[in-house]
Amino acid sequence: EGALDILIPLFKNEKPVFLTWLPLSHSYEHAVQFVQISLGAKVYYAESLEKLLSNMSVAKPTIMTAVPRFYQNLYSKIYMNFSKQKGLKKKLISSTISLGIKKLNKSRLSLVENFINFFCEKLVRRKIRNQFGGELKAFVSGGGALDQKIGEFLNSIGLPTLQGYGLTEASPVVSCNIPGKIKIETVGPPFKTNQVKIAEDGEILVKGENIMLGYWNKKKETDEVIKDGWLHTGDIGEITKEGNLKITDRKKEIIVNLGGDNISPSKIENLLCLSEKIKQSFIYGDKKTYLVALIVSESNENKKEIEIYLEGLNK
């Protein structure tokens, strides 16, 4: 019901077209199927991840749902292509990104900026949208934290990207950004079917008809996470003055170093993975005086480039 409240105004009298590639057994994708049925949507299933872009030109999706890793890869590929451009084309791309982020943040554009943005729309954003079928109205990210820089970048180049939040125990969506009111640093307002509050220690608590009855044959584990009807998510967050939910950390993943400092590994891991040369990263440093990063590179040939990137981050 909460998802329908967001999507119905977006499509009005049109029937949405989905292109999906996530496993149908995944709780996120499983919930999306119910949304598709409720909307009477046309659904295309991608042949494979490798053929996703070519499938987009055939399906011409108006909406796609995916996990953050997909958007991270998309960002890396587009950014790599942009970085190869020179001269006027490079300046136009730079203006597209900066003015797009300004519009995303509801900042007023000057007369000159509006003039430049007109050409950015025609010469850059429209071409990018056409590569994705030309009809895309929303990417929806869920199943993990989407890096703010990636969200801003995709929105700025004409690919509207909404970040949502949920967990399997909440069937599985709790909140999502609203088209036209995107606050990319948040996961949007909670659905009206949910009650959300922040505990004294900062943990996000959720209550509603979408909360699970419990873990199958595991009463002890159930009682640990559901107390007085409130699901203890294990995530740390806050509610902004606009009423949006903002995730700041994962309760059990906080690193406490030898000096007693609390460090969020996910923020550092996301920063590392912004490099197109880094496939995955893992940060460790509990009860240590230092942090260690375990990095999976795209290929062994990228070692020197990764070292240069890390040196830049450490400055």
What are these regions (language model features)?
Residues 198, 208, 213-214, 236-315:
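AMP-binding/adenylate-forming catalytic core of the ANL superfamily
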Residues 62-65, 77-182, 279:
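Gly/Ser/Thr-rich phosphate-binding loop
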Residues 23, 143, 166, 188, ...:
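Active-site glycine-centered loops adjacent to acidic/histidine catalytic or metal-binding residues
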Residues 111, 115, 181-184, 211-234, ...:
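Conserved ANL (AMP-binding/adenylate-forming) active-site segment centered on the GW(Y/F)…HTG consensus within
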Residues 21, 46, 141, 163, ...:
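Thr-Gly-centered strand-to-loop micro-motif
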